[in-house]
Amino acid sequence: MPAVSKGDGMRGLAVFISDIRNCKSKEAEIKRINKELANIRSKFKGDKALDGYSKKKYVCKLLFIFLLGHDIDFGHMEAVNLLSSNKYTEKQIGYLFISVLVNSNSELIRLINNAIKNDLASRNPTFMCLALHCIANVGSREMGEAFAADIPRILVAGDSMDSVKQSAALCLLRLYKASPDLVPMGEWTARVVHLLNDQHMGVVTAAVSLITCLCKKNPDDFKTCVSLAVSRLSRIVSSASTDLQDYTYYFVPAPWLSVKLLRLLQCYPPPEDAAVKGRLVECLETVLNKAQEPPKSKKVQHSNAKNAILFETISLIIHYDSEPNLLVRACNQLGQFLQHRETNLRYLALESMCTLASSEFSHEAVKTHIDTVINALKTERDVSVRQRAADLLYAMCDRSNAKQIVSEMLRYLETADYAIREEIVLKVAILAEKYAVDYSWYVDTILNLIRIAGDYVSEEVWYRVLQIVTNRDDVQGYAAKTVFEALQAPACHENMVKVGGYILGEFGNLIAGDPRSSPPVQFSLLHSKFHLCSVATRALLLSTYIKFINLFPETKATIQGVLRAGSQLRNADVELQQRAVEYLTLSSVASTDVLATVLEEMPPFPERESSILAKLKRKKGPGAGSALDDGRRDPSSNDINGGMEPTPSTVSTPSPSADLLGLRAAPPPAAPPASAGAGNLLVDVFDGPAAQPSLGPTPEEAFLSELEPPAPESPMALLADPAPAADPGPEDIGPPIPEADELLNKFVCKNNGVLFENQLLQIGVKSEFRQNLGRMYLFYGNKTSVQFQNFSPTVVHPGDLQTQLAVQTKRVAAQVDGGAQVQQVLNIECLRDFLTPPLLSVRFRYGGAPQALTLKLPVTINKFFQPTEMAAQDFFQRWKQLSLPQQEAQKIFKANHPMDAEVTKAKLLGFGSALLDNVDPNPENFVGAGIIQTKALQVGCLLRLEPNAQAQMYRLTLRTSKEPVSRHLCELLAQQF
Amino acid sequence: MIRFILIQNRAGKTRLAKWYMQFDDDEKQKLIEEVHAVVTVRDAKHTNFVEFRNFKIIYRRYAGLYFCICVDVNDNNLAYLEAIHNFVLNEYFHNVCELDLVFNFYKVYTVVDEMFLAGEIRETSQTKVLKQLLMLQSLE
């Protein structure tokens, strides 16, 4: 029954299309199109009124020309006219023209509202559907403003035809997604839920999508949908393959509707009502049982439809994560698919199993498939399947299989696609560290990584091995021996030279007893690589050499010779030259004792989190490492492998030598331990006391370096005020001045500026934040010529804030001379997330009269943002993970300032998140990511800002792992635009 | 949710483009070219799914035509794969060739709107869709 046939309807159109197809060249095509455009233009302009058919034909030709990629700048009015035609075919072409062209001409929308209104009111189901489809296809805010209120009524009206209900449900969905504020919730919502019971399966199919979307935002309003969805699902699942007639697809009853219902159920926790839950579990079991039955058809469509339901069922089982029996059955089912001949099924099984691996109930069951997965990694032809296999191996790894998995991944790395090498390297490094029983295995693994994929071993990975070796004396000798051997290779990667140089410089003495690795041999081995290395590596090696002079006095003459050589002392690179000069002098002037102190072994690194894990999280979004962090399936791992932390005493009472080495503020994991450390070392040696932490007011210049995060155990210890300012009780201070909020808002996206000014006093702020710490300078300027007396600024923590934010202040002079400025330093530590800023109360006497002023201190939670770069894919994955309704906060608001993209960018950066390019498909939108660092916890935040220049509105969406934070950030940021 | 539907031939000519989210015209052109590039290099041993930007493409090839649906990453792959087949299978298209899609481009949109709307599956029953399309065809 060829219902679609050539030339059916408009002959002129068919002729025109044929002509275009016959054009031999692009030029000929353009010529033909221009001729046609001229023809149509003259027809539209002519005196003779065109009949509906001609109008339809010409508009359709214009549409065809547009779809060929040419601009259309006329004909819109004719298209709009077609909407008021009584003939379906004319109306349809009019609507189609508008739906397709509307992007390029939004003026059009205003012109058609009337026609749509008429069609919606026409009671003619065909016309109503055309109008609804047009609204759904355009989906703009203007459409929402005009129609959002009408559509719920059409949807639930008793006399609406089924097809109209279907279209109305999805039309409403589109409007709700575009502008949720425009769709009024009301009594219709209850009736929408009951559409799940509708006799017409098409209506149910459309309604489920609408309900799924609505319930994500308003879970409580829609929770009755759970039991209705369960009973609907149960009826479908238990029906025979022919019961549903029209809705049976290759012997599978209503596959798409089943999938949609299962997805709806994933918006909610398992049903509380035992009867409902029992019925649901029965459904899930039936689906799993059916998967074992022989297929009713050999066609792939049959098995695809069946498996679509099966995979969605498994998703729901994983979502509930509460039925061990079902989880294990799901796992066994997926295990069968791992060896299926269909690539699609193998791919989906690997993907699905990855989530099963993180459930404590099914982790063991997943592990039994390890050989199959390893085989997939080796043999699959499609790279995306291999990628899934690698993901799954990572997810199923624990202490029992770590060695096998790591060695397989290493083997895979040799042939892995370039695009995924870095990720594999990170994964191997993390697994090796996490599950190392003896650290020699860990060291071997990392050195293998460098050997196999040196270019893909990022700084984090080789810093990490140095940190671990430094912190664990049981592995130092082995590490020295192994790097020494690795360096024997004729060609070794520069990263190997770096690791080797650092380790031998620290622990070379542990293998010096063996004549095969005597000090001169070690030195000449390293030095043989020197000339081929980059400046950074050579700088590191020079530091190794000076350490050698301390470790092995017998190498002193040789090394001094190397340092003295013209190629070092007069090196064009300033860093190398400086090191050579200073190390040479140091080795000549310093006594053995001094040398031994200065060049002592590095103290253990303070440890919070593996820097590699942080990097993988940055790559994959903050949730990526969660399966690993989560120690529940391997509780012993924390005891052994978490033992990386140094004993607190090492850090909180820094020994003089540690201080001398510039380690009192241990470099953050990401800072190069060697180059930065060595750089500081020199400065500290020659400047002596100046490098001690100064307790007095710090010079501005030292501000940043002073803020290097101190050891976590006692973050404030070094900065502590000898006399912490006593907080006056809240009753002692007045309420904040009325404009305090406004003043605070000015500082949400910036750190410096004038906080307050009146005729007497100006208060300036300069602040700097790093991780969960901040330092703020307040400058109080006396604008008068009279001295202020009893001047006392204090910081007050209202409510719970005391437990959330620690602020230490230094006292300032009680007198401020006329025209003078005093400075106050505040050290701030964010302990956990907080919502209200601390208050700053300033009191003084001016000319005998007491003055008091209370302001809000510009410390808001976003100051502790650490920007996080991530790729688009990771962003969206993470975004999806934060899909619980309470994790999201959204605001739609009018622009208060001109909408300038550059200004917006600057504000978002000032807000503290990273701005991610090429993430949002719409380049007008802004997308950001960051982690709020507090002492107690980290909160990952994702944000998206969608400007609508036409409406002068913004929509701001924040998703964080913590509900109040989402809301608070959303409010803070919304006030900035 | 479906982000867009594309029907392309092997040469990359677009036979249908249906968008369910806002893109400007340049972006649409870029997407069309990218989809063509990622889909045409794949063979029968590959999956019918390709990661694509922040989404994924579910595609199926019928003779010289590629039917591609771009959906969210957590959408059900097989359900959309069969949705393509359900769409193509429609009696309304019985024995239809690429050329018919060209000449009747304005009707194809109607079929799409019957089966997919607002990026969601609207109707899956072959019988119901066909009945509706025949009814519309009988209208003037």
Curated annotation (Swiss-Prot), chain A:
The modification Phosphothreonine is found at residue 653. Keywords: Cell membrane, Coated pit, Endocytosis, Membrane, Phosphoprotein, Protein transport, Transport. One of its GO terms (biological process) is Golgi to endosome transport. It is found in: Cell membrane; Membrane, Coated pit. GO terms for cellular component: AP-2 adaptor complex; apical plasma membrane; basolateral plasma membrane; clathrin coat of trans-Golgi network vesicle; clathrin-coated endocytic vesicle; clathrin-coated endocytic vesicle membrane; cytoplasmic side of plasma membrane; cytosol. GO terms for molecular function: clathrin adaptor activity; low-density lipoprotein particle receptor binding; protein kinase binding; protein-containing complex binding. The modification Phosphoserine is found at residues 626, 652, 655. Residues 646-665 have a biased composition (Low complexity). It is a peripheral membrane protein. SMART domains: Alpha_adaptinC2. Adaptor protein complex 2 (AP-2) is a heterotetramer composed of two large adaptins (alpha-type subunit AP2A1 or AP2A2 and beta-type subunit AP2B1), a medium adaptin (mu-type subunit AP2M1) and a small adaptin (sigma-type subunit AP2S1). Interacts with SGIP1. Interacts with HIP1 and RAB11FIP2. Interacts with SLC12A5. Interacts with clathrin. Interacts with RFTN1. Interacts with KIAA1107. Interacts with PICALM. Together with AP2B1 and AP2M1, it interacts with ADAM10; this interaction facilitates ADAM10 endocytosis from the plasma membrane during long-term potentiation in hippocampal neurons. Belongs to the adaptor complexes large subunit family. PANTHER family: ADAPTIN, ALPHA/GAMMA/EPSILON. This is AP-2 complex subunit alpha-1. The gene is AP2A1.
